[in-house]
């Protein structure tokens, strides 16, 4: 019996030492910014500390919304046929490391082309005047009129490697009719 146990132990040991060691884990990247909109007050104008919420056309602003225990930012044009507003993050310090932006977005009741959700980045936003900053549009996947209503989709990984130091990320929603909306959730920079 001892001999069988010894043999079994040695075979097991040989099996483990014969494994390929080429498996490696991807490098760890720390999260430098997260906004999941979970600590908010439902159906109020979005006023999270550090964010800018600016109506460019019309009077519609981004709102704080809560549905089924999930918080998110919503741009819903209820009164203005043509409206546009910017939701701008607080400054995010990217440091000197290559970073990635990711977020989720959804739409509802988009009746026609012309309504858009765009994402921008700036290194020179002063916190109040959107026209004085140099905004660069980022290529992100955002919902279209063909995206299922209320279904959050991934933006994809947006490479921010061309940027260092402090930046602001802006979400600009434009509507050409009332009753349609965009949602933003889970903004992450890592």
Residue ranges with predicted function:
Residues 3, 13-41:
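Bacterial Sec-dependent N-terminal signal peptides
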Residues 33-77:
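Extracellular glycan-recognition surfaces and repeat-rich motifs
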Residues 104-141:
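Extracellular ligand-binding interfaces
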Residues 141-190:
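Terminal, low-complexity interaction segments
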């Amino acid at each position: 019996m001892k001999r069988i146990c010894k043999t079994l132990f040695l075979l097991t040991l040989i099996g483990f030492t014969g494994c390929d060691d080429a498996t490696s884990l991807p490098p760890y990247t720390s999260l430098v910014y997260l906004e999941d909109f979970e600590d908010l007050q439902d159906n109020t104008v979005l006023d999270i500390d550090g964010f800018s919420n600016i109506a460019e056309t019309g009077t519609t602003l981004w709102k704080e919304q809560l549905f089924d225990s999930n918080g998110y930012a919503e741009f819903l044009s209820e009164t203005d046929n043509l409206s546009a507003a910017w939701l701008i993050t607080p400054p995010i310090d990217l440091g000197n490391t290559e970073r990635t932006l990711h977020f989720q977005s959804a739409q509802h009741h988009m009746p026609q082309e012309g309504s858009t959700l765009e994402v921008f980045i700036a290194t020179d936003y002063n916190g109040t005047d959107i026209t004085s900053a140099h905004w660069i549009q980022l290529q992100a996947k955002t919902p279209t009129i063909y995206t299922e209503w209320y279904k959050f989709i991934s933006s994809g990984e947006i490479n921010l490697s061309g940027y260092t130091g402090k930046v602001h990320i802006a979400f600009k929603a434009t509507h050409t009719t009332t009753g349609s909306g965009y949602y933003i959730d889970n903004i992450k920079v890592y």
